């Protein structure tokens, strides 16, 4: 029979008994530390599928702490990309919306010196973007840009 254990890299460090007695908080702290060392301090924002049921926060207020990040929802349909940002009505006069073909910039949110950048899931058109504020949500609607520039790549042997 093949001895799998001799190829297991942690055979001296971990045992089944130790894992059964492990504190879940310590394990979570360890995993977060490793993820942070590999992907950087803001690693959670790099993963599109974070929390399947995110906790909604109250809309941001002008007197809020500068480090507060709004809970931004992004979703797409066949023809459009939607970005929803919870924001209070007082912030509407200060916020400026700009975008490139792949990125949304929310200037003066949460601070004037640091614009919030949101990566879009696909290319969007330069014209035809609409922003609507209703019930504490700023919704930005982009039209998708169809990318028909296809190139064939030769396989070298």
Swiss-Prot record:
Q: Which InterPro entries match?
A: HSP20-like_chaperone
Where is it predominantly found? other
Give the transmembrane region(s): none
Q: Which intervals of the chain form a coiled coil? A: none
Q: Any idea where this protein resides? A: Spore coat
Q: Which UniProt keywords apply?
A: Germination
**What SUPFAM superfamilies does this protein's entry cite?**
HSP20-like chaperones (SSF49764)
Keyword Cell wall biogenesis/degradation assigned: no
Q: What induces it?
A: Induced in late sporulation stage by sigma K. Repressed by GerE.
According to its UniProt entry, the function of this protein is described as: Involved in spore germination; probably required at the earliest stage of germination.
Supply any other comment: Incorporated into the coat in two steps. First, independently of CotE, assembles into foci associated with the forespore. Next, in a CotE-dependent manner, spreads around the developing spore to form a stable contiguous shell.
Please identify the protein, giving its name as recorded.
Spore germination protein GerT
Q: Which gene encodes it?
A: gerT
């Amino acid at each position: 029979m093949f001895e799998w254990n001799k190829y297991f890299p942690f055979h001296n460090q971990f045992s089944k008994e130790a894992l059964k007695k492990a504190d879940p908080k310590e394990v979570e702290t360890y995993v977060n530390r490793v993820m942070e060392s590999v992907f950087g301090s803001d690693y959670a924002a790099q993963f599109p599928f974070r929390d399947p049921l995110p906790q909604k926060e109250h809309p941001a207020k002008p007197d809020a702490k500068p480090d507060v990040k709004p809970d931004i929802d992004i979703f797409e349909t066949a023809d459009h990309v939607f970005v929803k940002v919870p924001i209070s009505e007082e912030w509407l006069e200060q916020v400026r919306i700009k975008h490139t073909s792949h990125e949304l910039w929310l200037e003066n949110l949460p601070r004037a010196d640091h614009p919030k950048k949101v990566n879009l899931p696909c290319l969007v058109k330069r014209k035809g973007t609409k922003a609507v504020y209703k019930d504490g949500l700023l919704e930005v609607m982009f039209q998708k840009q169809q990318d028909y520039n296809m190139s064939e790549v030769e396989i070298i042997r």
